[in-house]
C-alpha cells in the first residue's frame, strides 16, 4: 500500500464503519436527494470482492427497486472517480442479473444509479460540483456518460450540509479535531485519544465511540506513519 493510499484509508474505513447501516444510509440519501427514504427499503450492496483489490467500493446500497446508490469518501481530489464508478456499477448490475435474463426478450427493470463523492480533504473543492466520465474521452463525440456529484463534507461551522444531518456533522468534526491536534504538535496517538474523549464528552459520535473506542483508535493510528501524518496535517 502506498503512503498516500494508507494515510487516506483510515478515513475511508471509519466512514464505512460509521455510516454503513440502513438507518444512517436512508437519512443520508434523503438529505442528498430530497427523496423520502425508508430505512426498511435500504439493502446494502457494498462491493468487497478481491477482484477489485484496492478498488473496493466504499458504500453502495439499493433503495427498494428504484435506485442503486454508490458513495465514495475521498480526502484527495480524484478526477478518475467517474471511471471507478463505472467499474463499480457494472459489477453491481452484474450481480443483479442472471445470464439467462439478459438474453430475455422481456425488458429487465433496473434500479437507477446515483453516484456521490463525499469529499473531506484540505484542498478546495466546490460543493455540489460534477465529475464527468466524458472528460476522460479522447473524442468529444461519445455515446456513454456517467456523472458523479461531489458534496463537500469538510468541517466548518458554515457548512450547511453538515448542519442538516448530525451524524455527518459529527463524523466531519471528529476527523477535523484529530487533524487540528496533530497540526498543533500532539502525537498522533494523543490526538486520537484526546479527540475521541472530547467528542464523547460533547455528544459527538458519542454512542459509536463508546462502543468502538479501541477499534477507532486502531483504524486511525495503524494506517498512519507518525511523520507522514504530521507533515500532511501541518500543510
Feature map (PLM): residue ranges:
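Coupling/switch segment of ABC-type P-loop NTPase heads
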Residues: 153-157, 162-186
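Intrinsic disorder/low-complexity signature
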Residues: 55, 167, 174, 222-225
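Accessory alpha/beta interaction modules
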Residues: 1-166, 235
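Short, charged alpha-helical interaction segments and adjacent helix-coil junctions
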Residues: 2-5, 62-75, 101, 151, ...
Amino acid at each position: 500500500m502506498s503512503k498516500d493510499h494508507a494515510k487516506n484509508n483510515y478515513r475511508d474505513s471509519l466512514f464505512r464503519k460509521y455510516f454503513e447501516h440502513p438507518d444512517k444510509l436512508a437519512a443520508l440519501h434523503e438529505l442528498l436527494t430530497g427523496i423520502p427514504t425508508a430505512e426498511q427499503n435500504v439493502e446494502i450492496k457494498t462491493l468487497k470482492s478481491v477482484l477489485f483489490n484496492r478498488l473496493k467500493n466504499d458504500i453502495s446500497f439499493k433503495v427498494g427497486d428504484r435506485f442503486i446508490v454508490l458513495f465514495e469518501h475521498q480526502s484527495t481530489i480524484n478526477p478518475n472517480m467517474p471511471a471507478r464508478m463505472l467499474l463499480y456499477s457494472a459489477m453491481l448490475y452484474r450481480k443483479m442479473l442472471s445470464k439467462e435474463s439478459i438474453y430475455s426478450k422481456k425488458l429487465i427493470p433496473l434500479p437507477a444509479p446515483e453516484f456521490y463523492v463525499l469529499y473531506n480533504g484540505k484542498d478546495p473543492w466546490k460543493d455540489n460540483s460534477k465529475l464527468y466520465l466524458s472528460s476522460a474521452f479522447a473524442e468529444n463525440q461519445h455515446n456513454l456518460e456517467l456523472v458523479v456529484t461531489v458534496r463537500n463534507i469538510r468541517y466548518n461551522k458554515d457548512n450547511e450540509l453538515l448542519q442538516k444531518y448530525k451524524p455527518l456533522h459529527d463524523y466531519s468534526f471528529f476527523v477535523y479535531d484529530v487533524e487540528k491536534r496533530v497540526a498543533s504538535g500532539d502525537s498522533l496517538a494523543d490526538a486520537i485519544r484526546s479527540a475521541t474523549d472530547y467528542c464523547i464528552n460533547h455528544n459527538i459520535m458519542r454512542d459509536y465511540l463508546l462502543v468502538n473506542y479501541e477499534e477507532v483508535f486502531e483504524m486511525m493510528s495503524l494506517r498512519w506513519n507518525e511523520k507522514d501524518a504530521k507533515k500532511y496535517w501541518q500543510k
